[in-house]
């Protein structure tokens, strides 16, 4: 009998089709719906309840059982606490990376193993190869949807227990499969917003957990131009929501966030989308989480992304210095953001990644 695979069912189209593909391939397939956020229960509209209903409907259509599990405590302790602490430092974190590492490919994997699973599967756009107890990560066929950026922190051992059924298909193909099968999720729009929390108004949401400290908005020359609502609400390269248009003695060019000074609680801005302060020659990152055996081959010339869907950028990684690496780019990079992740690639293979600590102008 073929292996038992438990699919993480999110209530979306990708995981729905992933489950169907595995069933078609002869696996013993079961679904599992993870609830990772409790706060919605007190609102009039609860997206988690709708997602669970959709996941259940799909599993009924595919005639597979659906398990449910609540990982809210794990999510709060391992993902959300970090998310808040980073924002309190004035940085811009990416909770989806930690959510994959700690919840989907750790808590979920371990729970699935207790249910007798040989593998887990998800609806991520990615590919992997398995050699013994180690998994290697590769880009999906659909480069527009490729999610390896968000998966770079998953442990290689977890990747060896994972199947990515939709990695060889494009999003339009996945939607077409779902439509032909009559799955209730075939036209459901893609989820956006914070991992598992959904499309909340970000400012309002963050204000529930962190006390905002308003402060000065200054030009790079030190002139006070206005007031910000709290450094946590702004990210490098941001243009919207600054409220400083139409200043006397300034050009019509828009203003952009170019720096944050946490000590003085000051937001620095500059005019023009090509302002030199928006660009960096390189960055300093923390320890690299390697998914391939390259750590003994530094310095290394490869490619990298500093944000999702960015085109791969040529770079060189230095050997570690006090647990940090210098990464220098062949071309200046716009709006690199501390707290986000740099993810490294060699052709289609994801080599790993690290947290961006500082920019090098």
From Swiss-Prot:
Region Interaction with target base in tRNA, residue ranges: 94-96
Keywords noted in UniProt: ATP-binding, Cytoplasm, Disulfide bond, Nucleotide-binding, RNA-binding, Transferase, tRNA processing, tRNA-binding
Region (Interaction with tRNA): 145-147, 307-308
EC nos: 2.8.1.13
Record-linked InterPro entries: MnmA-like (IPR004506), MnmA-like_C (IPR046885), MnmA-like_central (IPR046884), MnmA-like_central_sf (IPR023382), Rossmann-like_a/b/a_fold (IPR014729)
Cited SUPFAM superfamilies: Adenine nucleotide alpha hydrolases-like (SSF52402)
Catalysis: reaction(s): S-sulfanyl-L-cysteinyl-[protein] + uridine(34) in tRNA + AH2 + ATP = 2-thiouridine(34) in tRNA + L-cysteinyl-[protein] + A + AMP + diphosphate + H(+)
Keyword Secreted among UniProt keywords: no
Principal subcellular localisation of the protein: cytoplasm
Example of a GO MF term: tRNA binding
Intrachain S-S bonds: 99-195
Top-level taxon in the UniProt lineage: Bacteria
GO CC aspect terms: cytoplasm
Top enzyme category: transferase
Catalytic residues, chain numbering: 99 (nucleophile), 195 (cysteine persulfide intermediate)
Single GO BP term: tRNA wobble position uridine thiolation
Localization per Swiss-Prot or TrEMBL: Cytoplasm
RNA-binding recorded as keyword: yes
Residues noted as binding ATP in the record, renumbered to the chain: 8-15, 34, 123
Site (Interaction with tRNA) residue list: 124, 340
Family indicated by similarity: Belongs to the MnmA/TRMU family.
Function: Catalyzes the 2-thiolation of uridine at the wobble position (U34) of tRNA, leading to the formation of s(2)U34.
PANTHER family named among the record's database cross-references: MITOCHONDRIAL TRNA-SPECIFIC 2-THIOURIDYLASE 1, TRNA 5-METHYLAMINOMETHYL-2-THIOURIDYLATE -METHYLTRANSFERASE
Protein name (database record): tRNA-specific 2-thiouridylase MnmA
Gene: mnmA
């Amino acid at each position: 009998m073929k292996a038992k695979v438990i699919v993480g069912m999110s209530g979306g189209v990708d995981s729905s089709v992933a489950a169907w593909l595995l069933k078609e391939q002869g696996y013993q397939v079961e679904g599992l719906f993870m609830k990772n956020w409790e706060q919605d229960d007190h609102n009039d509209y609860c997206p988690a309840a709708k997602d669970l209903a959709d996941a259940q409907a799909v599993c009924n259509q595919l005639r597979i059982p659906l398990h449910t599990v609540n990982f809210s405590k794990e999510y709060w302790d391992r993902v959300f606490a970090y998310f808040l602490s980073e924002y309190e430092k004035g940085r811009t974190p990416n909770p989806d990376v930690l959510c994959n590492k700690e919840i989907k490919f750790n808590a979920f994997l371990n729970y699935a193993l207790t249910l007798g699973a040989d593998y887990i599967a998800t609806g991520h756009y990615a590919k992997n190869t398995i050699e013994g107890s180690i998994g290697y990560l590769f880009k999906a066929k659909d480069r527009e949807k490729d999610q390896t950026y968000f998966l770079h922190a998953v442990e290689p051992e977890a990747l060896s227990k994972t199947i990515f059924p939709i990695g060889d298909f494009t999003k339009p193909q996945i939607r077409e499969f779902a439509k032909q099968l009559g799955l209730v999720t075939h036209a459901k729009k893609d989820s956006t917003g914070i991992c598992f929390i959904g499309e909340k108004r970000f400012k309002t949401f963050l204000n529930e957990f962190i006390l905002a400290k308003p402060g000065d908005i200054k030009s790079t020359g030190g002139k006070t131009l206005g007031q910000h609502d709290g450094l946590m609400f702004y990210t490098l390269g941001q243009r919207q929501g600054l409220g400083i248009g139409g200043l006397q003695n300034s050009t019509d060019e828009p203003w952009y966030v170019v720096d944050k000074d946490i000590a003085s609680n000051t937001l620095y801005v500059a005019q023009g989308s090509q302002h030199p302060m928006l660009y960096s020659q390189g960055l300093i990152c923390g320890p690299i989480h390697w998914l391939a055996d390259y750590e003994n081959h530094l310095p290394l010339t490869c490619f990298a992304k500093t944000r999702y869907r960015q085109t791969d950028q040529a770079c060189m990684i230095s050997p570690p210095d006090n647990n940090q690496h210098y990464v220098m780019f062949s071309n200046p990079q716009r709006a690199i953001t501390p707290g986000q992740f740099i993810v490294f690639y060699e052709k289609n293979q994801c080599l790993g990644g690290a947290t961006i600590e500082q920019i090098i102008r």
